[in-house]
């Protein structure tokens, strides 16, 4: 077992009840272009086209053969593009239940599948996009070979769903999906199942080729970047792949039914949610519809993903992200506070002892307010308190801010994704957002070396 001692469990109100309910019915779903790092789409549909679930919507020009398939049947109502015609979303109005079927196998056959059989089904169904690489967090090329594959079956993000609750609903499908993963490279590459040390994820009998790694401690103990760092670290010449536990369920369903499984069980939670709980919805769900009559009055920000590293869901991207397993809702913090810096701050939280809210175990109604403007980095040891990885965070963040990619690479930035620096952003006295800085550095390193 690996114990994470440095980090932070955010004391945020609105913790979800770990019981699954049916969410609001949604009649719109979307694929979000921003989810796929570096992807350039070659569109296979137009507005007004009627599509089946599992039909190809677009292909990656930079990664030929990697296709992105419709999460529902219906009509393509809008293809949203932003600046420089960057794809924002492909929106489908859900109609009917027509779907494309793929090759199915008996459960007893899964352990003897060839790598080619597994790969073909994943590619044709679009489930190849469940994999992401580290470094760079991109959908892997079809000819890429990783050092290992990580399955993340734990989540320490604030307000997250408990994977154990979800996996009890799909125990057989999860096991089938894990078996399929062991066959992707004919059993030649290790598959690591990372779980909470206290969780009772059903894996009996043991699956050949699956190695279980247990983690405990504070967030980011549940991030895949943490798992990779301690189990099979990556570098400039070494790549691993990872995917989440609900995509493993979908893979198991695909191979045993021949159908694309697009259900998602997510956490709908946060200070502004009336009844925080786990809800059953679908991949790419319209979040305005999903959260209708679920939120407290006022101006709210709906986030696809975690409050620490998720994306604001509004306008053309008002949809559940491909990799998001939670929807978080905060009040917009637009109110100005006169002399707030000299107040005791019993209703505020800080990792430093500058406010009364630091003491005790109270949960706080966090808002989107950052309580200050962006300014220079202030190295007071805050980053070191929340960074459990074997890197020097202050120096790394300085290099990212300065655009020094050579030094940043030497300090370990290739191991990281935006979510791995989210706590550094949260505790930064200078209110700097290090996620975009990291992404800019990674893009430059990938392009220039």
From Swiss-Prot:
InterPro entries attached to this UniProt entry: NqrA, NQRA_2nd, NqrA_C_domain, NQRA_N
Single Gene Ontology BP annotation: sodium ion transport
Superkingdom classification of source: Bacteria
EC main group: translocase
Annotated PANTHER family: NA(+)-TRANSLOCATING NADH-QUINONE REDUCTASE SUBUNIT A (PTHR37839:SF1)
Assembly and oligomerization: Composed of six subunits; NqrA, NqrB, NqrC, NqrD, NqrE and NqrF.
Keywords: Ion transport, NAD, Sodium, Sodium transport, Translocase, Transport, Ubiquinone
Protein name in the entry: Na(+)-translocating NADH-quinone reductase subunit A
Family per record: Belongs to the NqrA family.
Known function: NQR complex catalyzes the reduction of ubiquinone-1 to ubiquinol by two successive reactions, coupled with the transport of Na(+) ions from the cytoplasm to the periplasm. NqrA to NqrE are probably involved in the second step, the conversion of ubisemiquinone to ubiquinol.
Catalytic activity as recorded in UniProt: a ubiquinone + n Na(+)(in) + NADH + H(+) = a ubiquinol + n Na(+)(out) + NAD(+)
Gene3D superfamilies (alphabetical): 2.40.50.100
Entry's Gene Ontology molecular function annotations: oxidoreductase activity, acting on NAD(P)H, quinone or similar compound as acceptor
Enzyme Commission number, as recorded: 7.2.1.1
